[in-house]
Amino acid sequence: MESERAAYAFLPQTPIKSTDAHLVEFSEAMRAVAKTLRQVAEGKAAAQAEAAEWKRKYELEKAVKAHRHNTVTKGCSNCDKEKLEQLASQLTLETTSVDPTSCCGNHEICSRQILQDECPGTNKISHDKIAARKAPFKLSWGCNGDNNGQHKHDFVSFEKGDITTAERSNKQILLKWESPPQTVLFVTKPNSNSVHALCAEMVRWLKEHNNINIFVEPRVSKELVTEDSYFNFIQTWDNDEEMKTLHTKVDLIVTLGGDGTVLWAASLFKGPVPPVVAFSLGSLGFMTPFSSELYRECLDHVLKRPFGITLRSRLQCHVIYDSAKNEVDTEEPILVLNEVTIDRGMSSYLTYLECYCDSSFVTRVQGDGLIISTTSGSTAYSLAAGGSMVHPQVPGILFTPICPHSLSFRPLILPEYVTLRVQVPINSRGQAWASFDGKGRKQLGPGDALICSISPWPVPTACLVDSTTDFLRSIHEGLHWNLRKSQSFDGPVA
């Protein structure tokens, strides 16, 4: 805000002596006013973000209900009132919460059955069904390799003055379909002939052997249909509004590429993300455990049998511009799967940032920049900057400086429930630039702030074996972690 800028600009210009009580009192009052104005701005930003989220949910539900009504009316114009009401009741969107213990037992998590409808204009072919539902599934815990859905709960007990924790168990999350998946979305690496050929082959195989509905990106749809009229059955979306309801139609996502393709697929979903099966066709593949040569066996297993998943946390970010309007830059939060990077861009000055964790001051960053990363992104830019590699299912936020101007500035790992605020001070000499998963750069000037917290919508990725085995395999094969020659041993001296 302009008043806060003026307050901070006035303070260093006014010489304050310890003997001048009036100036000391005035300086403290100005600082208190600036702090209060900043808190008001942050509160307004949080309220706007919450209102935007509720607005998005309302518009989504309204669009689905409106389309459902149009579909029912069009398909039953000659039906009587009683039959119409009966059909409408069968297509009711289920939005009420379900007690997990009543439908799945104490050790499983049910998916909500969400109405799957066809968006008008997305496909010109007629379909046999008026509407279909997404395939419901259950999430259960695997215990020490046993897929029976039972596990030991972690708890802390206090007995006879001693605090003890229960024995921990392997908690691999398993996904089991309650009905066969009906719709698969393909997300592919662009400008690759081999990926394009494999995508066409996989789409043909899924349609002929499993009768799966196929969604692809508009770019891929145009390429496939131009190449062969056989692919006229594939579906796509025409605008952002249709893309917002994509998660209500898609049961499974298949990515063909590297980690960048997985990041792009996750960015298409601003809310819930369907399970992702990632095939490795890129350079490094920390999130792509499946081999494209065995796609038939892999997809057959994922579509018909339980499989392990890794819930990869995402960060939700808001940019607050300290301007006269003092409004959040975007109505919806920016979701990132790897990291948010704040650097100095083209500026010749060091980046100067003030960092807060909830309401507690953390530190001031002076250096090339700062990385706020998820645990999935710990093997990306954060690792190159000296951060630790962290298992993707460890809940936390990585706080990694980039070339800090201090030998004691070491990386941190913070709990996942905190909210981080990184702001450019009013008296900063230069500006900063924020990028989100390597794209969408935004300029941050003096007084601007970036708010980051863990999103409630993770990205579930399918495991080849289990989350731990896949993670260790990726750092061994992808990074050649701790690879060295073994020390020779010639036996004891005689």
Swiss-Prot record:
ATP-binding recorded as keyword: yes
Organism superkingdom: Eukaryota
Cited SUPFAM superfamilies: NAD kinase/diacylglycerol kinase-like
NADP found in the keyword field: yes
Enzyme class label: transferase
Catalysed reactions, semicolon-separated: NAD(+) + ATP = ADP + NADP(+) + H(+)
BP-aspect Gene Ontology terms: NAD metabolic process; NADP biosynthetic process
Sorted UniProt keywords: ATP-binding, Kinase, NAD, NADP, Nucleotide-binding, Transferase
Entry's EC annotation: 2.7.1.23
Gene3D superfamilies linked to this entry: Probable inorganic polyphosphate/atp-NAD kinase, domain 1, Probable inorganic polyphosphate/atp-NAD kinase, domain 2
Record-level Gene Ontology MF annotations: ATP binding; NAD+ kinase activity
Family: Belongs to the NAD kinase family.
Protein name: Putative NAD kinase 3
Originating organism: Oryza sativa subsp. japonica
Lineage: Eukaryota, Viridiplantae, Streptophyta, Embryophyta, Tracheophyta
